[in-house]
Design a protein with these regions (language model features):
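Catalytic-core "active-site belt" of small-molecule-metabolizing enzymes
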Residues: 1-67, 73-74, 105-109, 117-126
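A conserved acidic, glycine/proline-rich C-terminal tail/linker
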Residues: 69-105
């Protein structure tokens, strides 16, 4: 999936993390690819790649997400249980980002690919 964020700060690096979290601008929308079935037991070795206008701009292993994306899922489950809350059927859980935040400031096509899992893309226009 691709996570869409808004840049509502003049200089995001000069803001306290608490203000950014409260604003909610960094968790705005998600673009999904096609649903797939994968029976891998080693999600941390998947490689995520980000392309802008068909040029690869970043790649990294999924182990950047707490050492293994499943660790992020376990953390989420633990937090829900600690708060005595439940995960609802059909709830979507995004586990984190393999790539860094990249600001888009002009029309382009952005594609995210996770090797052996699939891809999704979005076109930004004026």
């Amino acid at each position: 999936s691709l996570e869409l964020v808004e840049n509502r700060f003049l200089d995001i690096k000069k803001n306290k993390i608490e203000h950014i979290i409260i604003d909610g601008s960094l968790g705005n929308s998600i673009v999904f690819g096609k649903e797939i079935s994968n029976h891998s037991s080693n999600f941390s070795k998947f490689i995520g790649r980000l392309f802008i206008n068909n040029k690869e701009v970043y790649s990294n292993f999924a182990d950047t997400i707490l050492g293994d994306p499943l660790n992020a899922l376990l953390w989420y489950f633990d937090q829900k249980l600690r708060l005595k809350k439940y995960i609802k059927k059909g709830e979507i859980v995004s586990l984190g980002s393999i790539t860094p935040l990249i600001w888009i400031d002009s029309p382009c096509n952005v594609k995210a690919v996770i090797d052996d899992l699939g891809e999704c893309s979005i076109n930004f226009i004026n």
